[in-house]
Amino acid sequence: MSRLLFVALLAISLGYVASSSSNHLPAGLAMDLGPGVNLNERFFDQVRALIKRRLQEKGLAKPEQPELAMPLTDDDAVALQNQRSYDNVPLPAASVPTPVLVENWPTEQHSFGQVTAVAVDPQGSPVVFHRAERYWDVNTFNESNIYYLIEYGPIKENTIYVLDAKTGAIKSGWGSNMFYMPHGLTIDLHGNYWITDVAMHQAFKFKPFSNKPLLTIGKRFRPGSSVKHLCKPTSIAVATTGEFFIADGYCNSRILKFNAAGKLLRTIPQPPEFLSLQVPHAITLLEHLDLLCIADRENMRVVCPKAGLISSHGEGEPAATIQEPDLGRVFGVASFGDIVFAVNGPTSMLPVRGFTIDPRSETIIGHWGEFKNPHSMAVSVNGSALYVTEIGTNHQTNRVWKYVLA
């Protein structure tokens, strides 16, 4: 009886995966969480393999007979020669920090709207970017990705708040009457704020508390796929060299690399690069490894192509890829040292939680946390704290979590 129940549950689970869509999510979340789960073939191959092993362990399926080795074709040989030379030795367990939740943080509840992003400034203060009363739903954009609600004007409230790292109390705020549909926030080592607005189809660089951008990429309210346009950009990563990367985003599914002055240097992917992205939702840099790690959301993976900061050597090589059956749709990534932290979002019946990833060995080396709709994350400059935001439909579900990295 227990065996039959086990098989039935597996069948139901697979059926649920295939039929899942964002329509099952709460109102106000569906569009931002994506139009549905993209069925990635490699992901489901791994799921099928996992189920087959479980059935074999329980005696419900015969073990497969080993296949005879086939000679390599010329194409196979070329592919092997082009593989990466990453160090596949996993990091020592003692060197991997473990996120530990800080209970009762913040000490006072905030009345944020959807908290789409968090960053940490050079002083160690967490900074949140929220939508106030705005929600992204089916009435926000038309089929050409044009923002429907321009006539309502920008959000009148402060959209950016600087919090106290110890208590979570609001220290200061700004960003009123500037943004229409906030999405991404990054703060560089000089304290500059890098912001994306999906309604405006633009990315900005600001000095703190300034209402005039130092740099603007994209055309205001004009989505497009040319080198001068963006379409619902999601995230920005900034190198110490001043070069920066924009994840562009919901429509174009590409990464754009610029020099410090805003001149386009590179598009990822580009021929002959063998890489396909589907909603790059967040990005983070591991400069010492010369890697740009991407939350490739609808492909249910984290991919880390060469950033090309040290040299152009290695650009276009196959990206390090982390994709396992329990990873699901990846919404946020952040990094410190050799480690990438990630959070997934609602994906069928998979747990929604945090992941610790070693990009060099392309493995998940830890799980932590429990969430409902996480959207963004950031690590403090000194690596002592990790913050995760969630978006929801009320003040209780729109919030920020703090973890210490022990």
UniProtKB/Swiss-Prot annotation:
It holds the Pfam family NHL. NHL repeats lie at residues 168-209, 218-261, 264-308, 358-402. Residues 1-19 form the signal peptide. It comes from the Eukaryota. It is an enzyme of class 4 (lyase). Its EC number is 4.3.2.5. Gene3D superfamilies: TolB, C-terminal domain. N-glycosylated. Its cofactor is Zn(2+). Belongs to the peptidyl-alpha-hydroxyglycine alpha-amidating lyase family. PANTHER family: PEPTIDYL-ALPHA-HYDROXYGLYCINE ALPHA-AMIDATING LYASE 2, PEPTIDYL-GLYCINE ALPHA-AMIDATING MONOOXYGENASE. This is Peptidyl-alpha-hydroxyglycine alpha-amidating lyase 2. It comes from Drosophila melanogaster (Fruit fly). The gene is Pal2.
